[in-house]
Protein backbone atom coordinates (compact mmCIF):
# COMPACT_ATOMS: atom_id res chain seq x y z
CA UNK A 1 0.00 0.00 0.00
CA UNK A 2 0.96 3.64 -0.40
CA UNK A 3 1.95 6.10 2.27
CA UNK A 4 -0.12 9.13 3.23
CA UNK A 5 1.78 11.92 5.01
CA UNK A 6 -0.02 13.41 8.00
CA UNK A 7 0.99 16.75 9.52
CA UNK A 8 0.43 17.20 13.26
CA UNK A 9 0.77 20.66 14.81
CA UNK A 10 2.56 20.61 18.16
CA UNK A 11 2.74 23.77 20.24
CA UNK A 12 5.77 23.78 22.55
CA UNK A 13 5.93 27.41 23.65
CA UNK A 14 2.70 28.65 25.24
CA UNK A 15 3.91 30.75 28.20
CA UNK A 16 1.16 31.38 30.72
CA UNK A 17 -1.40 29.32 28.83
CA UNK A 18 -3.76 27.66 31.35
CA UNK A 19 -4.30 23.92 31.12
CA UNK A 20 -7.31 23.08 28.95
CA UNK A 21 -7.41 26.59 27.44
CA UNK A 22 -8.16 27.07 23.75
CA UNK A 23 -5.17 28.60 22.03
CA UNK A 24 -4.44 30.61 18.91
CA UNK A 25 -2.41 29.35 15.97
CA UNK A 26 -1.41 31.77 13.21
CA UNK A 27 -3.74 34.42 14.59
CA UNK A 28 -6.88 32.27 14.73
CA UNK A 29 -8.73 30.03 17.17
CA UNK A 30 -12.15 28.45 17.69
CA UNK A 31 -14.18 27.26 20.68
CA UNK A 32 -17.23 25.01 20.46
CA UNK A 33 -20.23 26.44 22.30
CA UNK A 34 -20.39 23.72 24.97
CA UNK A 35 -16.73 24.21 25.99
CA UNK A 36 -17.32 27.07 28.42
CA UNK A 37 -15.44 27.14 31.73
CA UNK A 38 -18.35 28.60 33.68
CA UNK A 39 -22.15 28.59 33.27
CA UNK A 40 -23.71 31.20 35.56
CA UNK A 41 -27.44 30.91 36.14
CA UNK A 42 -29.63 33.97 36.68
CA UNK A 43 -32.86 34.40 38.61
CA UNK A 44 -34.72 34.43 35.30
CA UNK A 45 -33.16 31.33 33.72
CA UNK A 46 -30.03 29.49 32.60
CA UNK A 47 -28.10 28.19 29.60
CA UNK A 48 -28.40 24.52 28.63
CA UNK A 49 -26.38 22.42 26.17
CA UNK A 50 -28.24 20.91 23.21
CA UNK A 51 -26.15 17.86 22.19
CA UNK A 52 -25.51 17.26 18.48
CA UNK A 53 -27.23 20.50 17.50
CA UNK A 54 -25.86 22.35 14.47
CA UNK A 55 -22.96 21.63 12.15
CA UNK A 56 -20.20 20.49 14.47
CA UNK A 57 -20.66 19.52 18.12
CA UNK A 58 -23.64 21.11 19.88
CA UNK A 59 -25.45 24.33 20.71
CA UNK A 60 -26.21 26.26 23.88
CA UNK A 61 -29.47 28.08 24.51
CA UNK A 62 -30.98 29.90 27.47
CA UNK A 63 -34.29 28.76 28.96
CA UNK A 64 -37.15 29.56 29.40
CA UNK A 65 -36.98 29.69 25.61
CA UNK A 66 -39.58 32.47 25.33
CA UNK A 67 -37.78 34.78 27.78
CA UNK A 68 -36.09 38.07 26.84
CA UNK A 69 -33.38 38.40 29.49
CA UNK A 70 -32.49 42.07 28.98
CA UNK A 71 -33.45 45.04 26.84
CA UNK A 72 -30.99 47.78 27.82
CA UNK A 73 -27.20 47.43 28.00
CA UNK A 74 -27.17 48.25 31.71
CA UNK A 75 -29.36 45.16 32.35
CA UNK A 76 -27.03 42.65 30.66
CA UNK A 77 -25.27 41.48 33.85
CA UNK A 78 -28.64 40.22 35.14
CA UNK A 79 -28.83 37.64 32.32
CA UNK A 80 -27.47 34.06 32.27
CA UNK A 81 -23.79 34.05 31.33
CA UNK A 82 -21.28 31.67 29.74
CA UNK A 83 -17.54 32.26 30.17
CA UNK A 84 -14.95 31.04 27.66
CA UNK A 85 -11.19 30.96 28.28
CA UNK A 86 -8.89 31.59 25.31
CA UNK A 87 -5.17 32.24 24.83
CA UNK A 88 -3.58 34.47 22.17
CA UNK A 89 0.06 35.36 21.60
CA UNK A 90 -0.43 38.94 20.46
CA UNK A 91 -2.53 41.72 21.94
CA UNK A 92 -4.66 43.69 19.52
CA UNK A 93 -7.86 43.82 17.54
CA UNK A 94 -9.61 40.57 16.73
CA UNK A 95 -12.81 39.68 14.92
CA UNK A 96 -15.03 37.43 17.02
CA UNK A 97 -17.19 35.37 14.68
CA UNK A 98 -20.29 33.95 16.35
CA UNK A 99 -21.94 31.00 14.63
CA UNK A 100 -25.55 30.83 15.77
CA UNK A 101 -28.81 29.17 14.85
CA UNK A 102 -30.48 30.78 11.80
CA UNK A 103 -32.91 32.87 13.86
CA UNK A 104 -35.25 35.50 12.47
CA UNK A 105 -36.94 38.32 14.39
CA UNK A 106 -40.57 37.62 15.28
CA UNK A 107 -41.64 40.56 13.08
CA UNK A 108 -40.11 42.54 10.21
CA UNK A 109 -37.79 45.16 11.64
CA UNK A 110 -37.55 43.28 14.93
CA UNK A 111 -34.44 42.44 16.91
CA UNK A 112 -32.42 39.38 17.93
CA UNK A 113 -29.47 40.03 20.23
CA UNK A 114 -27.15 38.82 22.99
CA UNK A 115 -24.53 40.35 25.29
CA UNK A 116 -20.73 40.12 25.21
CA UNK A 117 -17.98 41.18 27.63
CA UNK A 118 -14.20 40.79 27.28
CA UNK A 119 -11.99 40.38 30.36
CA UNK A 120 -14.59 41.75 32.75
CA UNK A 121 -15.15 45.01 30.89
CA UNK A 122 -18.62 46.51 30.53
CA UNK A 123 -20.82 44.14 28.50
CA UNK A 124 -22.10 45.26 25.12
CA UNK A 125 -25.43 44.53 23.46
CA UNK A 126 -24.75 42.71 20.16
CA UNK A 127 -27.46 43.05 17.53
CA UNK A 128 -27.63 40.02 15.22
CA UNK A 129 -30.01 41.41 12.59
CA UNK A 130 -28.44 43.80 10.03
CA UNK A 131 -30.15 46.96 8.83
CA UNK A 132 -32.48 46.33 5.92
CA UNK A 133 -32.88 42.63 6.69
CA UNK A 134 -36.15 41.14 5.38
CA UNK A 135 -36.87 37.55 6.38
CA UNK A 136 -38.70 35.43 3.82
CA UNK A 137 -37.82 37.70 0.89
CA UNK A 138 -35.60 36.13 -1.81
CA UNK A 139 -34.27 39.59 -2.69
CA UNK A 140 -32.62 39.79 0.76
CA UNK A 141 -29.15 38.28 0.22
CA UNK A 142 -28.50 37.94 3.96
CA UNK A 143 -31.69 35.92 4.49
CA UNK A 144 -31.09 33.74 1.41
CA UNK A 145 -27.53 32.86 2.49
CA UNK A 146 -28.68 32.02 6.02
CA UNK A 147 -31.35 29.67 4.68
CA UNK A 148 -28.88 27.87 2.39
CA UNK A 149 -26.11 27.64 5.01
CA UNK A 150 -28.52 26.89 7.90
CA UNK A 151 -26.48 29.13 10.18
CA UNK A 152 -26.25 32.81 11.04
CA UNK A 153 -22.81 34.42 11.24
CA UNK A 154 -22.39 37.48 13.48
CA UNK A 155 -19.09 39.40 13.48
CA UNK A 156 -17.98 41.46 16.49
CA UNK A 157 -14.77 43.50 16.87
CA UNK A 158 -13.01 42.84 20.19
CA UNK A 159 -9.71 43.85 21.78
CA UNK A 160 -7.71 41.01 23.35
CA UNK A 161 -4.66 41.08 25.58
CA UNK A 162 -1.58 38.92 25.10
CA UNK A 163 -2.00 35.64 26.95
CA UNK A 164 -5.17 34.56 28.73
CA UNK A 165 -8.54 36.18 27.96
CA UNK A 166 -12.04 35.54 29.25
CA UNK A 167 -15.03 36.04 26.98
CA UNK A 168 -18.47 36.43 28.57
CA UNK A 169 -21.57 35.63 26.50
CA UNK A 170 -24.95 36.69 27.93
CA UNK A 171 -28.41 35.45 26.95
CA UNK A 172 -30.59 38.04 25.25
CA UNK A 173 -33.65 37.40 23.10
CA UNK A 174 -35.24 33.96 22.57
CA UNK A 175 -33.73 33.55 19.09
CA UNK A 176 -30.13 33.39 20.33
CA UNK A 177 -28.59 29.90 20.19
CA UNK A 178 -24.79 29.71 20.04
CA UNK A 179 -22.92 26.96 18.17
CA UNK A 180 -19.30 28.16 17.98
CA UNK A 181 -16.97 31.13 18.53
CA UNK A 182 -14.00 31.89 16.26
CA UNK A 183 -11.41 34.63 16.77
CA UNK A 184 -9.30 36.06 13.94
CA UNK A 185 -6.52 38.60 14.51
CA UNK A 186 -6.73 41.77 12.41
CA UNK A 187 -4.83 41.27 9.16
CA UNK A 188 -5.36 37.50 9.08
CA UNK A 189 -7.70 35.72 6.67
CA UNK A 190 -9.96 32.89 7.79
CA UNK A 191 -10.05 30.17 5.09
CA UNK A 192 -13.46 29.30 3.67
CA UNK A 193 -14.86 26.11 5.20
CA UNK A 194 -18.27 24.54 5.53
CA UNK A 195 -17.61 23.47 9.13
CA UNK A 196 -15.44 26.40 10.17
CA UNK A 197 -12.08 26.45 11.94
CA UNK A 198 -11.53 23.44 14.27
CA UNK A 199 -10.71 24.15 17.89
CA UNK A 200 -7.31 23.48 19.46
CA UNK A 201 -7.16 22.85 23.18
CA UNK A 202 -4.10 22.59 25.38
CA UNK A 203 -3.76 19.43 27.46
CA UNK A 204 -1.27 18.26 30.06
CA UNK A 205 -0.60 15.05 28.19
Locations of regions flagged by a protein language model:
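Extracytoplasmic
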Residues: 1-205
